[in-house]
Structures are given as C-alpha cells and as structure tokens.
Amino acid sequence: MTTLAIDIGGTKLAAALIDNNLRISQRRELPTPASKTPDALREALKALVEPLRAEARQVAIASTGIIQEGMLLALNPHNLGGLLHFPLVQTLETIAGLPTLAVNDAQAAAWAEYHALPDDIRDMVFITVSTGVGGGVVCDGKLLTGKGGLAGHLGHTLADPHGPVCGCGRVGCVEAIASGRGMAAAARDDLAGCDAKTLFIRAGEGHQQARHLVSQSAQVIARMIADVKAITDCQCVVIGGSVGLAEGYLEQVRAFLMQEPEPYHVALSAARYRHDAGLLGAALLAQGDTL
C-alpha cells in the first residue's frame, strides 16, 4: 500500500510517496509558512500534497510538537507560532480524502532508525538536534509515545539550573542551550544575529566564540545522553537533525560522552535515514507497525 508521508518541521514541509518496501518517490519540499497561522499552513499543505494524493491510499504525518487526538500541541509554543491546537489529522483527511495518522516527528524518526538497526538491538534512543532538541525512545522493541504524547521530549530535561529560560517555561533546558535556536540566541558581538548554520561555518574557520558555542552544545547533548543511558539502559543512541548531522558534531558529542564515567557510555551513530527518517517512520506506523 502506498503511503503519502508528510514531515512538518519548523522551517520546511516535506512530502513523498512511500511503498511497503520503504522506497521513496516524488519527494517534494516547501518552506514552512513564515506566518505560522492555521490558514497559511492549510494552504501550504494543500499545495504540497495535491500532486501526490491520487497515488496514495493513506496519509502519515510526522510533525513537530505533541500530537494529542489529532491536534497539534507543544511544550514550547514558540515552535508552533499560531498553530497551537491546529486540527492536523482532520485537516489532512479533508485535503487528501484519505485516512490519516499523525505522530511526533522525533518519535517517527526513532521508529525508522530502530528498523535500520540489527535485530539484536531492542532498546534504543533517537535524538534530533536541530531548531529544537527532541527524541524518541524504543524500549523492548516498542515505541514509547505516552498517553499524552510527551514521551521522548528529551530537550526539555535540565542542563543548567542557572541557564536561559526555555520557551516551555522551565529554566536551563537542554533545548535552550544546545539547539540551533539556543546557540544562535547565545551568540554575541560579531556573531549576533547568526543562525546555527553560519555558526558552524564560522567555527570551521576557527572563530573562537563560534567554536565555543558548538562545543557547548555537544557537551550538553553528551551529558543528556549519559542521563538517558541511566534512565533507559539503551543499547545505542542515534543522532539526527541539522545540528546533529553537521560535520564534526557527532565526534564532539562522542568525545564528551567518553569523559563521563564508564557505566554511562553507549554506542553513538548518525541517523541512517538522515532527513527522511520522519517520513519513513510515519509511513511504517501507518502501514501497520504497532506502537
């Protein structure tokens, strides 16, 4: 059965047709509407899926935020703008005229990456470091979503009790420091106003402050992974996201993790499906994989 998979992120929307063998075809992308209003997102989704819907039999959505009963919610409302309580499933069912499933994008990506691992891996954690920091947890071969959809929101664990205020309302969350947005917010002087991509470029050029911001992000993520290992005793951690997959970043995270006591060490790897993980994981779930 062909699935129309959609990935809704903070900066871009992606859609593709995915068959039962996880082959991706007709992949399309559009920028996420800058206004982040319900009408703008609805029109963008319509434009994105219209050329694809005739060949699909169902829709699977991987979206930023928390999905509760088909509605879009968020720990950090700033990530959604005016889209809080957006009726995601109902909107796509109306646009596509097809049965629709929606799941958090990091949870979906975790499920895809889990399927790419050897059969003897039953416990894994996926972490995405991008505009925000998210995650997904697979325990004994089952994806944890939680009754309220909150499971895996690792970016809202504590990194620094004296750190910046996070958009979720807590002080010193991992996301507020280690995410692309957090790094950009901390940039000063000649780096003020730079986005994360620019910070990585400047770090590669040897800019001291940029190198510090990237290193600080990697250290915060490494410490979070040590916490995750203590909580889940996972067999491996897979890292994705635009920051997580940036050149040299995973190596820095690995080096910082090795500074933690040995019981907190865990195998790290880059996401195999990279930026398609959310699409593939949502399709897998829609095609019959159970949570």
UniProtKB/Swiss-Prot annotation:
Its EC number is 2.7.1.60. Pathway: Amino-sugar metabolism; N-acetylneuraminate degradation; D-fructose 6-phosphate from N-acetylneuraminate: step 2/5. It is an enzyme of class 2 (transferase). ATP binds at residues 5-12, 132-139. GO terms for biological process: N-acetylneuraminate catabolic process. Zn(2+) binds at H156, C166, C168, C173. The keyword NAD does not apply. Keywords: ATP-binding, Carbohydrate metabolism, Kinase, Metal-binding, Nucleotide-binding, Transferase, Zinc. SUPFAM superfamilies: Actin-like ATPase domain (SSF53067). It catalyses: an N-acyl-D-mannosamine + ATP = an N-acyl-D-mannosamine 6-phosphate + ADP + H(+). GO terms for molecular function: ATP binding; N-acylmannosamine kinase activity; zinc ion binding. Homodimer. Catalyzes the phosphorylation of N-acetylmannosamine (ManNAc) to ManNAc-6-P. Belongs to the ROK (NagC/XylR) family. NanK subfamily. This is N-acetylmannosamine kinase. It comes from Salmonella typhi. The gene is nanK.
